[in-house]
Amino acid sequence: MAMKPEVEQELAHVLLTELLAYQFASPVRWIETQDVFLKDFNTERVVEIGPSPTLAGMAQRTIKNKYESYDAALSLQRQVLCYSKDAKEIYYTPDPADLAPVEEPNAEEQTGAAATPAAAAAPAAAAAAPAAPAARPVAELPDEAVKASLLLHVLVAQKLKKSLEQVPMSKTIKDLVGGKSTVQNEILGDLGKEFGSTPEKPEETPLEELAETFQDTFAGSLGKQSSSLISRLMSSKMPGGFTITVARKYLQTRWGLGSGRQDSVLLIALTNEPASRLGGEADAKSFLDSMAQKYASISGVDLSSASAGASAGAGAGGAGGATIDAAAFEELTKDQKVMARQQLEVLARYLKMDLNGGEKKFLQEKNTVAELQSQLDYLNNELGEYFIQGISTSFSRKKARVFDSSWNWAKQALLTLYFQIIHGVLKNVDREVVTEAINIMNRSNETLIKFMEYHISHCDENNGENYKLAKTLGHQLIENCKQVLDMDPVYKDISKPTGPKTNIDKNGNIKYSEEPRAAVRKLSQYVQEMALGGPLTKESQPTIQEDLTRVYKAINAQAAEHNISDSTKLEFEKLYGELLKFLETSNEIDASATTRLAGVVDDDLDKDSTKEVASLPNKSEISKNVSSIIPRETVPFLHLKKKLPSCEWAYDRQLSTLFLDGLEKAAINGVTFKDKYVLITGAGAGSIGAEVLQGLVQGGAKVIVTTSRFSKKVTDYYQSIYAQYGAKGSTLVVVPFNQGSKQDVEALIDFIYDDEKNGGLGWDLDAVIPFAAIPENGIELDKIDSKSEFAHRIMLTNILRMLGSVKKQKSARGIETRPAQVILPLSPNHGTFGGDGMYSESKLSLETLFNRWHSESWSNQLTICGAIIGWTRGTGLMNANNIIAEGIEKMGVRTFSQKEMAFNLLGLLIPEVVNLCQRSPVMADLNGGLQFLTDLKEFTGKLRGELTETSEIRKAVSIETALEHKTVAGANADAAFAQVEVQPRANIQLEFPTLKPYETVKKIGSPDLEGLLDLEKVIVVTGFSEVGPWGSSRTRGEMEAFGEFSLEGCVEMSWIMGLIKYHNGNLKGRPYTGWVDSKTNEPVDDKDIKAKDESHVLEHSGIRLIEPELFNSYNPEKKQMIQEVVIEEDLEPFEASKETAEQFKHEHGDKVDIFEIPETGEFSVRLLKGATLYIPKALRFDRLVAGQIPTGWNAKTYGISDDTISQVDPITLFVLVSVIEAFIASGITDPYEMYKYVHVSEVGNCSGSGMGGVSALRGMFKDRYKDQPVQNDILQESFINTMSAWVNMLLISSSGPIKTPVGACATAVESLDIGVETILSGKAKICIVGGYDDFQEEGSYEFGNMNATSNSLDEFDHGRTPAEMSRPATTTRNGFMEAQGAGIQVIMNADLALKMGVPIYGILALTATATDKIGRSVPAPGKGILTTAREHHGNLKFPTPLLDIKYRKRQLKNREAQIKQWVETELEMLKYEAEGIPAEDQETFYAERTEEIKREATRQLKSAQAQWGSEFYKNDPRIAPLRGALATYGLTIDDLGVASFHGTSTKANDKNESATINEMMKHLGRSEGNPVLGVFQKYLTGHPKGAAGAWMMNGALQILNSGIVPGNRNADNVDKLLQQFEYILYPSRSLKTDGIKAVSVTSFGFGQKGAQAVAVHPDFLYAAVDEATYNAYVAKVTAREKAAYKYFHNGMIHNTLFVSKEHAPYSDELEQPVYLDPLARVSSDKKTGALVFNGKGIQSSSQFVSEENRKTATIVSELAKKTAGTDASGVGVDVELIKSINVENDTFIERNFTEAEIAYCKKQPSVQSSFAGTWSAKEAVFKSLGVKSQGGGASLKDIEITREAGKGPEVVLHGAAKEAATKANVKNVKVSISHDDFQSVAVAVSEK
């Protein structure tokens, strides 16, 4: 077992303490030390290595005080230095300024004649280039022919893509190419083409010698190859018209260079080729100037004289040249201009053209434009800029978002709730849980109930209190859902009403909060509070005394009117008098109290009880309506008004009774809005409208909501509302809308009413809630501006327009009996607040609709309900007033939370109020009594002033107190109490799987699994990695699971993208270790990286707009094509080389003329009429988005060399990085380590690709066709198997199987299948599998032509961002999103994985591929993979016992007994086989034969394990492959928790794949209500084709190890078509489960490729091994994890994650012997530590016959000898399989072994092997006694095997065994024991 972390930490602490103690306790003796090196050794240079000059300072003081005169006498000059500040002096680094030559610049040089030194910078430095001479040419230098050495040097450097300085002439070509034979052949071919014949083996000759050899026969001129390269350089990188002739002329006139020297300059230019075509002639000349200077420095030529001559000439010309007067020149050329003009006019008249037509048209247009501009200016001045900009249209039908998949969100909400309880996030049933229960009930259906029943029935209460709570709540919720199954959904809010609270702390900070109201704990009580009103809303209430007086007067009046008898009057008078007397004398009754009655009901929802959930479906009877407690002469806080004849609105008790009673019903039992169609505007986040929206969708309404800020963030907000609250039958539509635009208003209503076939919704509105508004704060009467007018338009004009449009649509459709109820947003603010522009006027003007409803003709289409909205806290308009709300309430006014006001407004939609509105307009006062508060403005100002004053006083007191405290106690008095914040540090983990305690593992898997499986037939994934749009598998996993990067994720992404790098050394003169910014070299702390880089990382990762710099400048908006054109006129001539000119002639024949240019030897080429040209053109391509690797990703960051990067296709780099990261994830830091465990032939590579090296293919076809430079070996990089070849050549050096699948988009899963088959067949034990593909414009264009990919322009039109264009399983999915990258897994058999101690991420239980049916469409999706569920059901009554793991285990036990018997028999028979063997060979014979028997027994056992463990279902028609694969590990189809979908976001695939998975589950009998969780990874990554399945498998393995199932975050609305697939759930957010047992991965590729893989949690493998094996494995994995962690972080720091191998693990001499010995293994070289093959171990017999087996052979040979003698009367042989001894069975151990035996066995390294050996000995002893057996269950405790130090095992008999031996005359029993990791063998001999 591994050492526990606590113990390690304790030991480290002790060690550190001891080291420090030793250091402090030991004397330093520094003075003596100084004397030694200063005096004894006379040291002159002292260097301190450390962070600061501590010792150096002491040494300097010592020298000055003690050795100054001593040094003077000896002439010693000492130097004391410190590494941290004197690095330059220590390393003798000169200052760059000192190296610069000191020259006296002349006047010409000071004006800019110096040439730019660097070719690469030439274009940028064009401005600084020397001006061309204006006068005579420069003096020519003596010409010199080009030298063979320069020509050779350039050709080699150019081919290697290096500068001349990087190619030393002392090296050979073979050395320079670094083993790249293809490049070497190219260079030799170029040399042959250039120089003719070449000497023998030129590649092995140093370039210096080779140049001398060439010089002997060299003619001194450029050859074919160099001329061709120069010609290509000029044509591809120089500006148009800048030909070789022009260049040579410039070099001759500017620098005085002859043709030979010009050749040399042009040759040098080949190794400094510009990256792109130069912009103009000045750039080209600057480039040539820099090349000339470079040539001068190489050849030693001085160009300054030429430069000076040119400058002098220019100066002379400028000073003494002839000049001409401008007027004279004009006079000279006047006649020429007149004649030219006359000729032009003659031609114009002939062609009937008006030369001044354009000018005339321009003047007309100018006038028109001026007139239009005048109108615009007028409108701008009149309406204002804000108004004009504000009325712009934003509505678009295409951008409408429709949310209606409540059926899916219900299951997701249930699972979220379930797992939150399981994980302890929710520990009791509070109001949040009850609210969620209501939402679930509102979505209740049969499928949902089955879903709940399954999960609750499988919730084991024994797992803890959380599971118990989940089960209890679940049962109640199920019953609730059953009860409301046929009921309509209801809006029911059970949240606690809150009130405002403003506090000012001691430091003067004003803090506002919402706190529950003490007496109002639920909405039913809230309604009561509203009905009662407050002191401010009531008139003075009568006392009891006053009421009695009124009653007395009323009775007297009645008596007088009805002639009541006097006796009755007297009796009444008497009673009344007694009552008054009683009240006067009573001390208990207060006659002055009011007669108002009120009651408060306790809140039973505050209790932690699940009973509330159980009571939810019950419709409570309201015995006493709230209206009964409305006090007389009191106006409720909420009430309805009626219109008086005076046209004023007054409180109406009867109407208010209806309203409040309806509100009470809604609060207690809820209210439904089913089949209601509602339009709501102004429902942004934090508004009243948003709360109203929640209530509407919760009640089942169909709602269209508008937003003026349409964006992904906004639509996600509304989607989250629907996902949480949307009830069955509800719909939410979100559209962009500007209520200030008339066009938008009309378009919106048209959209609502248009038929669906016309792109509309086909709705008829039942309610309109136009709440849109904008604030106008601070605008008084004299400041009414453009914004105020626009606000008025929004809040009044366009509301009227909107209502008019609704009326128009209803009338057009003849809708007269279904009026839409309009909830008008009125306000109590009738100028009361002031300073709010035209807000009050807008609200007041809406009230005219109450009259117009009667006076106009639209009462059958619209009803009016005005809502005077009171003080609502927290909204955008009132947020600033929150702090004074508490003060307002103290005055008797009731302010409202947003939820309360939303509840009030939704109460206006109840049937009672709707019916009232249909009779007459209704005015609802929801003001809370605010209208009764006079001088509101003054009062609010006073409240705010008091708060401000109190705050400022407390602030001042706080500051004064702090100053006083510091003065008294000191400035640092609080230092001890200061809060210390621990800053986070990034700690990137490799995420090795968590290994549970063995006891936990055994509980997870079936106990019968142990020993059942042949682990060599179990394939596991031990490492995985990827390179993709989100970086590595770690960073992609973070983004997929959590939707954001952690600190570690940001650090890794920043490193990947080259934003940061690691620094260790001096930085700005001080030592620094840590991250630095790659651009600025400034230090960056870990904690700051996320804040600094995250926005850049997110912008340049994932799915995004195509970045041209990543794809050879490919810009889809300017995709280049070529078109063939036949020219109709002769073209102007251009210049080309002779070779090129002849090629033109060869192609065009007589359609081209070519002539040599004598001066340069170049040719003039002229294309004639009829010649054919291919002319480039650009088109706008509509696929603008793709999943791209992070910008800045560079293989060099990982350690891949520049040579490799320049040589291979980019996809190969992705693969190399992925492979090395997969090995690191496997804990393998040196790939050669594999050969310690397997032969080189047993490591295979089965990875593949859909297209392979597309960049190479592009080079082969497109670039080669365009005659652009392309490496000659480009062909090899295009092969799909080349990537695997590079992996082997640079990393692995294996000789195992290589299989390269090509399965289009299913390649990676096909690779898995091939890899698994390769290992199972025995051809390999370790395989690299996976897939990879690139993204390039060619593939993108062709996918677009197939309409397979997402149309970016169409997506933009629909308002989608690039990140959401891949939307699998959604209603709006519209094509897949291409991506690029690689994904790799390392797989091996489980036996090897356990032995190596590599991490196991998952078991590959099933891999399969399948084709589809007859068809004519290659990409058409099919269901062939459904065959993995093929299973015959028929009418069979009984299931096959093979699926019973206990049955299979029993069969295996029987077979093990047979194998045991066979081994014993074979061992006994060896004595007969050995009879003919010479004595000297007998030992070898027994060793080899016993090894053979053991191996055969092992084979038989493994065959039996395969038969009963993992292959029992194969070819059995009753067991589907999928069912059998799961049953192997004791799992059923119900245990398949997750299905990772291919999910490409195409209409066809997502439906077909869902149907396939659903039918699989259904056919195999998956339980109803148990859907698999669907994972759709491509929403995040896009579709990388070949890598798709690999990324999905990586994600599946992460799911198994984390239990987190990622959601499809782009699934805004799941397609209704998918609702029919009841066995699939489509989550949109991640779910943290309590564990996933198995995951299915499906993949579909163009070309009839379907594939599936199932990964099972590794715990089910661990359950199949014994405890000792598991614990040993845990220790190995722990060690590997530490080593891998260290290697990974060192690799990041030093950019050495990838270290390519320079040599194979064997020498050339050992290559063939290693290949031919399957038992050859590597070992560590004693000198270098490298893992290499040693010749001594090859073909060694010790590799075959193990040392353990030799002991067995000795025992068996001794047995043969003893049985051949006469002294042996009894012999017993027993063989036991190690695994067959169950050491965990305490009963078995205690019954058969003595305490001494048990103690001995438990001390041994392998406890199970020791027990097995002892048991074998006991059995052998029993057999040797020759007595009758007492049965298989008899105890063997009486036979004791003792062991003494230095002695072998001895037999001690007790009890019955001793008696039996005595009866059989046995005097002594000897026994020998041998065991290995497979079996134990014991031989016992009884002596008589």
From Swiss-Prot:
Gene Ontology BP terms: long-chain fatty acid biosynthetic process
List of residues binding acetyl-CoA: 1774-1776, 1800, 1810, 1819-1829, 1843-1846, 1873-1875
Region Beta-ketoacyl reductase, residue ranges: 675-874
Keyword annotations of the record: Fatty acid biosynthesis, Fatty acid metabolism, Lipid biosynthesis, Lipid metabolism, Magnesium, Metal-binding, Multifunctional enzyme, NAD, NADP, Oxidoreductase, Phosphopantetheine, Phosphoprotein, Transferase
Active site: C1305 (for beta-ketoacyl synthase activity), H1542 (for beta-ketoacyl synthase activity), H1583 (for beta-ketoacyl synthase activity)
Keyword Magnesium: yes
GO MF terms, alphabetically ordered: 3-oxoacyl-[acyl-carrier-protein] reductase (NADPH) activity; 3-oxoacyl-[acyl-carrier-protein] synthase activity; fatty acid synthase activity; fatty-acyl-CoA synthase activity; holo-[acyl-carrier-protein] synthase activity; magnesium ion binding
Pfam (any one): ketoacyl-synt
Modified residues annotated as O-(pantetheine 4'-phosphoryl)serine in this record: S181
Region listing for Disordered, in residue ranges: 98-118
Keyword Repeat belongs to the record: no
Ranges for domain Carrier: 146-221
Chain positions recorded as Mg(2+) binding sites: D1774, V1775, E1776, S1874, H1875
Catalytic activities: acetyl-CoA + n malonyl-CoA + 2n NADPH + 4n H(+) = a long-chain-acyl-CoA + n CoA + n CO2 + 2n NADP(+); a fatty acyl-[ACP] + malonyl-[ACP] + H(+) = a 3-oxoacyl-[ACP] + holo-[ACP] + CO2; a (3R)-hydroxyacyl-[ACP] + NADP(+) = a 3-oxoacyl-[ACP] + NADPH + H(+)
CDD domains xrefs: elong_cond_enzymes, KR_fFAS_SDR_c_like
Described function: Fatty acid synthetase catalyzes the formation of long-chain fatty acids from acetyl-CoA, malonyl-CoA and NADPH. The alpha subunit contains domains for: acyl carrier protein, 3-oxoacyl-[acyl-carrier-protein] reductase, and 3-oxoacyl-[acyl-carrier-protein] synthase. In this species, higher amounts of C18 than C16 fatty acids are produced.
Subunit text: Fatty acid synthase is composed of alpha and beta subunits.
Domain comment (free text): The N-terminal ACP and almost all of the KR domains play an important role in determining the carbon chain length of fatty acids produced.
Protein name per Swiss-Prot or TrEMBL: Fatty acid synthase subunit alpha
UniProt organism field: Lachancea kluyveri
